[in-house]
């Protein structure tokens, strides 16, 4: 199993059949995939096929494993060198603080321990699929991590189009990002 259950260009993702992508995700899942998870992945695939179609030059990864904490980011998008972390809550209708904290923890962990993320802008996004639209303002902290943006199933694409012109980065390939060294800070005993 690689660091992500599925990765590729957005254009390839858009052309692939939904069931084929779902199959790849299920093959990579080392646990017995429950129907709830299958349905969540199916919903994420459907939403993203609609919402990111205008970014065919970007790249996408599903279920990226963060080694230090053992959690998985639902979706990573790399568009124009910017890293977007999407945490879906399929069926939810509120922008929960716990979900914002969860995706921010992922962003912080990547920023400080993942070599290919350290000098990059990282934009964490929560996606409770049934939530009402919420206004978003891009606000970057000093370390290059944005405040969490809030999207639903209908506005991911428009939020990406709103924030991308405000940021600039050199190109970054998903393969290079996935293969980058993960180097946690040594503990006191190790130091």
Question: Residue spans of the language-model regions?
Answer:
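Accessory nucleic-acid engagement/destabilization modules that flank
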Residues: 1-185
């Amino acid at each position: 199993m690689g660091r992500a259950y599925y990765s590729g260009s957005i254009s390839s993702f858009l052309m692939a059949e939904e069931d084929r992508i779902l199959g790849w995700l299920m093959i990579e899942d080392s646990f017995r995939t429950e129907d709830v998870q299958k349905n969540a992945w199916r919903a994420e695939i459907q939403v993203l096929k609609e919402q990111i179609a205008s970014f065919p030059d970007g790249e996408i990864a599903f279920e990226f494993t963060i080694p230090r904490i053992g959690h998985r980011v639902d979706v990573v998008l790399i568009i124009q060198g910017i890293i977007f972390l999407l945490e879906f809550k399929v069926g939810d209708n509120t922008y929960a603080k716990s979900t914002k904290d969860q995706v921010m923890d992922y962003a912080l962990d990547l920023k400080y321990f993942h070599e290919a993320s350290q000098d990059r802008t990282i934009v964490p996004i929560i996606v409770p699929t049934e939530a009402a639209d919420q206004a978003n303002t891009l606000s970057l902290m000093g370390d290059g991590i944005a405040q969490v943006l809030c999207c639903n199933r209908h506005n991911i694409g428009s939020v990406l189009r709103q924030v991308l012109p405000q940021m600039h980065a050199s190109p970054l390939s998903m393969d290079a990002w996935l293969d980058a060294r993960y180097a946690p800070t040594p503990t006191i005993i190790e130091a």
